[in-house]
Amino acid sequence: MMDKHEQGISMKIGNNRPLHGSVLAGVVGVLVLAGCQRQGEPAPATDAAPAAETAAVDPAPAAEAPLDLRDVIENNEREVVGISYPAGIDRYPGLARALQGYATSARSDLQQALDGLGNDKPTMPYELSLSFEKLLETPQLVVVSADGSRYTGGAHGEPLVARFVWLPQQQQMLSAEKLVPDAKGWKAISDFVAEQLRERVATRLSGEDMDPAQLQESLRNASRMIADGTGPQADNFSQFQPLTDDKGQITALRFVFPPYQVGPYSDGTQTADVPAAVVLPHVAKDYVELFARG
């Protein structure tokens, strides 16, 4: 049974802080330097050889393995797996590898849960549902979302929520830590987001039929979860997506919070938009030109 979770999700899995996260991607390069002397055989005394003759030559870096971003559909009595990738994303190999790494990690966790059953069969098939979607593509920015769930027993699946912000010109991922490098910036963002989320939950709860004491208790509980999940650290805001104008410049950042981070599971994935005017004074100088001004 595949659940479809609400749209909007950086790298966090279930109740844990970022898999997001974070995302596993990379290639191991092995450098081997040869040249050893036989044991037990004294080396003859010779004049020092010219540097050109004795300098070891580093081998060329190992070639990266080719990408294989094919959609996955598997269905048997023990597991149901569905993974889909956006078309053409292999144009950006570094980004594609990050997506592949995230999916591989999620699949590995599912397999680990299945291995824990031994020869037993789960009462319901374990499930991994993961969809990558390209949200934005400009010469400066490519943004991909990952949304889905992993079910390994219990009342419901673990939400899978991540955002990937790729800078094609720099060939690198843009992380929250790089974008806003100082504590003062995260304090400003934290205050703005927390207030927005508190106002939203207050509006929702005030429309429900509950007595004043119950309403106040619900508001206190909600405020406590929001405060815990929006503390002024980059880790709490690791999942974000830029919103841009028609020129491709960033006008706001949409921060994405999976279930349990700022509210109960029943509230689903939540988002908060922070305008460029709030963020820009704290953005690292290397990324200021990505933002709209005025």
Regions found by a protein language model. Give the residues of each.
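Bacterial N-terminal signal peptides that target proteins for export
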Residues: E6-A25
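Compositionally biased intrinsically disordered regions enriched in Thr/Gly
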Residues: Q37-G294
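C-terminal motif of bacterial Sec signal peptides marking the signal peptidase cleavage site
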Residues: L33-G35
